Amino acid sequence: MADTEDDIIIDVQGLRTAFGDHVVHDHLDLQVKRGEVIGIVGGSGTGKSVLLRTILGLKKPDAGQIKVFGIDFETLTPDERRHQEQRWGVLFQEGALFSALTVAENVQVPYREHLQMNDALMGELAGIKIAMVGLRAEAAKLYPSELSGGMKKRAGLARALAQDPEILFLDEPTAGLDPIGAAAFDELINDLKHTLGLTVFMVTHDLDTLYATCDRIAVLAERRVILIGTMKDMLASDHPWIKSYFHGPRARAAAASA
């Protein structure tokens, strides 16, 4: 059965992005279904993070159209855009926590920016989000410099979830984590998806994460999406890069542990 318009939460058509004469994407098409976890993979320089940032509006496309929630954000006023952007949360690779703020204060940043809310309510909501991502209550008072790598990821995720987003954007969420920490983060993403009904758009190179979390995978190569499908579709592909990536030694280890 064909997907209806309501099923598609992110719709990228004919995207072209470039930095000067260097073209990153050309005629790139991608549709993300509501409620799925989609993993974006590709070789170095294929523009995985550029695609994420372009969808977020942090880079202007040179051609093509991007719709999120069925809306072309290029048609919105700045106020309308800010309102719609509250419907998604973002966790960048570096976490982007404010070093001078505690974990709780970091989580409260979106409330202070977008909502008129008293301190007691902000503190209560921040506590809920901190618990939701598996951090202990004591972590609320800690500063980023006092956190482990895994705790920083979870604190950043708590802030991304602050306003109950419909879409969660993740840029290399398990980068820098040890295998145990990465597996725990994968489990958390699965739990949040099922509990909150999230759509998750994830740039990752982590094969274990692809196996553990993704409903579908989109492969970037040759300036576009060359294949989108399930892990089974990836394993059946004869494309040289896909074959090398999904059938190499690391892939076999990931498959064995899945």
Where are the predicted features?
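Conserved catalytic motifs of ABC-family nucleotide-binding domains
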Residues: 164
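Helix-to-loop junction immediately C-terminal to a conserved catalytic motif
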Residues: 56
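Catalytic Walker B motif of ABC-type/P-loop ATPase nucleotide-binding domains
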Residues: 168-171
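Conserved ABC ATPase signature
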Residues: 143-147, 151
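Conserved ABC ATPase "signature" region
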Residues: 72, 119-138
